[in-house]
Amino acid sequence: RTGFGTFGGSLKDLSATDLGVFSSTAAIEAAGITPDQVDHTFFGNALQTSADAIYLARHIALRSGIPDEKPALTINRLCGSGFEAVVQGAKEIILGEADVALTGGTESMSQAPHVVRGARWGGLRLGPASGQFEDLLWGALTDTNCGLSMAQTAEELAERYGVTRSEVDEVAFHSQQRAKTAWDDGRFDIEVTGVGLRTRKGETTYRADEHIRPDTTVEGLSALRPYFKDDGLVTAGNASGMGDGSATAI
């Protein structure tokens, strides 16, 4: 996998496809196979932010050296898209349709665009925009069928199942500490591949999980205000972060 960049962080200028190529080429090398041995590519991508998102799995496969006659499929099962890619790859092998499958998931939330609905059909005129200006990222995080965002859903579930703010903050705290320990102990060395970046200072290699805050404390978390409800439990400290990254398994 790549390291995971925070929202608007070090990986913001790389598309989800770009990130998928980094993890896929590294996985092929780690597995000790050649690209032409891959029979099928399955890649999960929930928020289709790259310009070539419609071709994502295909482009990752081609750019990873997999021959163009080998099929590829992009999967959207929301947060489970990468897991579903692994499931589909395993099914192909079980059914005898493939011996080797390249599977994974990739997202670039930082590259989610703003769009103007109706602009194609004359929705834009001189002066104030008459089209509907829309944040594709914020829209994706809200289920219009029920009118709830992910965080609001968390608040509903917490109330239903009696989850407390202190319990949620404890989980967030231990998550941060475990992530730091894993990095300090070298547990991620075998799985995290470097991502080459061009900066104003020249070429550099990114290899980190940018969203980790090892100085997080329970006291600091408990001092944060709830974001969606005055008496709620979802805060900037215990909610899942938005970010960019990719992971691949052969």
Show where each model-derived region lies:
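Active-site-proximal alpha-helical scaffold in enzymes
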Residues: 76-107, 152, 158-187, 248-250
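Conserved catalytic cysteine-centered active-site region
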Residues: 11-14, 41, 45-100, 133, ...
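Structured loop/turn residues at beta-strand edges in well-structured enzyme cores
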Residues: 33-36, 68, 96, 190
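Conserved active-site "lid/cap" helical segment
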Residues: 1-46, 50-64, 71, 153-165, ...
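Short glycine/serine/threonine-rich phosphate/pyrophosphate-binding segments
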Residues: 4-6, 53, 83-87, 109-112
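Flexible glycine-/small-residue-enriched beta->alpha junction loops
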Residues: 100-156
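Beta-strand segments within the central parallel beta-sheet cores of soluble alpha/beta enzyme folds
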Residues: 36-44, 71-76, 101-105, 167-174, ...
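N-terminal extracellular/periplasmic Venus flytrap/periplasmic-binding protein-like
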Residues: 1-2, 12-25, 30, 167-250
